[in-house]
Amino acid sequence: MENPIHLLLMAVVQDQDLEAATRSVQSIGATVTYLSSAGGFLGRRNATLLIGLPAEKEKDALEALQKSCRQRIEYLTLPLEGSPMPMPAPVPITVGGATVFALPVERFEQI
């Protein structure tokens, strides 16, 4: 039997989207493993999904992630520069969605 895993997608998603993203990707027949991780900029908890799949299912997996991982507006408080008092100013930032890396798989074994 030929190896069905030819592509590894590494998708970084927000914790809030983890369950929906996992179900969505599993629904197309892909194998999913997740690792807890944290973002560097905001330090928020997120998850890195390791998704193994045949190369021809890459588009389906990306569509599944796009449907289940949504972007959100959150506010980060930063001190006002030049202010005599350190008053925080809320700054809107866009977070969420998914950051996806695609890697070819030369060899895959289940032991």
Locate predicted features:
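Positively charged, small/polar-rich N-terminal and surface patches that mediate targeting and assembly
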Residues: 1-111
